[in-house]
UniProtKB/Swiss-Prot annotation:
The chain crosses the membrane at residues 6-26, 30-50, 62-82. GO terms for cellular component: NADH dehydrogenase complex; plasma membrane. It catalyses: a quinone + NADH + 5 H(+)(in) = a quinol + NAD(+) + 4 H(+)(out). Belongs to the complex I subunit 4L family. This is NADH-quinone oxidoreductase subunit K. It is a multi-pass membrane protein.
Length: 102
């Protein structure tokens, strides 16, 4: 089975990263911000996998495992913060929560 060309894989990773960055800057809902961060991390992981496959090195797979474990830790901590924020302020809007004191 032929491998995906390096340029195509990196282009997809770049597009995914840009989509995640736009979602991070545009959306005000914390849940969507966390999802955008996950998309950006997966784009970086895809770039590692494609680059590692191009040169036949296992380093890309090792970095992928590290990125996935970091993403899991980020998701668990982020969701815990999200739940506490919703319980305290009854909103998931970043701007509304940052203006409230308590």
């Amino acid at each position: 089975m032929p491998a995906i060309p390096l340029e195509h894989g990196l282009a997809v990773a770049g597009i995914l990263f840009c989509l995640g960055l736009v979602g991070l800057m545009v959306r005000r809902n914390i849940l969507f911000v966390l999802m955008s961060l996950e998309i950006m991390m997966n784009a970086a992981a895809l770039a590692f996998i494609v680059a590692g496959a191009r040169w036949g090195q296992p380093d890309g797979q090792v970095m992928f495992i590290l990125v996935i474990s970091l993403a899991a830790a980020e998701a668990s901590i982020g969701l815990a913060i999200l739940l506490q924020l919703y319980r305290r302020f009854h909103t998931l809007d970043i701007d509304a929560a940052s203006e409230m004191r308590g």
